[in-house]
Amino acid sequence: MSRLRLGRRGIIAATLAAPAILGGRARAAGTIQMISHRYPALEYFAEKMRTAIPGTTVNTQLMPYDKALELITIAMSSKSDTPDIVYASDAGFQTFVKNGWFRPLDDLWAKYRDEFKLDDFPDSVRKNFTHDGKLYVMPHTLNAMMFFYRKDLFGAAGKVPPKSFTEYRDLAKSFNSPMRSGNVSCLKPVDAAINEAHWYFNALGDGWFDQDWHPIFNDAKGVQAIEMMKEIAQYAQQGFTAAANDECMIAYQQDIGVMGLQWATRAKAMDDPAKSRIVGKIDWVAPPQGHARMGGDGYAISAFSKQDPDTLFRIIATSASQASIRGAASLLIPPRTSLLNDQELRQANRFYPAALASYEVGTPVPSLPEFYAVGEFITRRILQAVTGETAVKQALDTAATETTDFLKGHGYYK
């Protein structure tokens, strides 16, 4: 069985939290358990799940991505009958499916196709969550990493958004000051650092792997890509090596940084007067040179759940209904055709043009079930390079060797 590698600290934290998720005797009779990553759109969908079926109790637990991934892995690898409903990204679901942890949804999809207007999800969206011809995840969002920048500061300085990494580096240097960083970097392992490295490796290099899953991120182009990341990181906010999406979103909201890469699902929060000091001052464009991460996420049914699968499907389908996603349209890129083509929604959400442009030029992460497992040590080696602890070439070569050894041990390169 392929299992995600968990650090000692993560194992301890996850084990302490496990009783709430694994359920056991403490589980309330009939209560449906859902575990999820957390950001504004997913908080909205969690509320929709809690109220989806009158008289049915849904306990939702939301947390940062890496912690959710650890806890889901512990529960599923032990074949616990909770959680029942599980968050999945377009990248992470591959691991769960390969391990036999998700229930295929095809029969339920066909059964409820008309009631929930499921044909409104285009084939291109469903394909993101299909493995060996079977669908495993109900799509809830499309997402793309955009380039966030302070349009007020750019305007005052007579600058325009960068079109290349060289321009990005030079602008970050010019805006950097004790008051605010020229750049906002999110390099906390694993997920956040993967997001940023993915952009550099694909825009400046040839990606992570060749067609046979041999690492290529340590070739000459890959080394140059991380050298550029290292240069730009000189102008990042304090604590960037421990910053994930939440911390970077706050850095923009609190006027700590000028520009950088971030998810479209974080755009609306820039204009939240209750949390943001820079309302109306952020704008967005497609990332310089394209190839930043794009994808989506949604919810699946555990293969080990003892709850009625029809009930579980109705809960996730209700949360992903046309009406539900319309209500969250300011927090995401809608995965339904009817909403993507809705001109009223496009006009009401000023980040849509940049989000759609970013999605069009984006690149998904590799469809490798073990991607996040190898990503754990790849991103930590990248941090060693960016912080100057290790030379870039040496760090990437070490990561490539570790990746090769891991994948060879999991049946690759036969």
Predicted ranges, named:
Residues 29-39, 57-61, 85:
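Short, well-ordered beta-strand elements
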Residues 1-16:
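N-terminal secretory signal peptides and thylakoid transit peptides that target proteins
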Residues 264-278, 288-381, 412-414:
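C-terminal lobe and pocket-closing loops
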Residues 131-140, 145, 166-215, 257:
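Extracytoplasmic/periplasmic solute-binding protein
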Residues 171-176, 212-241:
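Glycine-centered hinge/linker elements that transmit conformational signals in sensory
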Residues 106-120, 187-188, 204-224, 271-292, ...:
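Short, solvent-exposed loop/beta-turn-alpha elements that line the ligand-binding surface or hinge
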Residues 91-144, 169, 196, 279-283, ...:
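Hinge/lid segment of periplasmic solute-binding proteins
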Residues 51-120, 152, 156-163, 251, ...:
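Extracytoplasmic "Venus flytrap"/periplasmic binding protein-like
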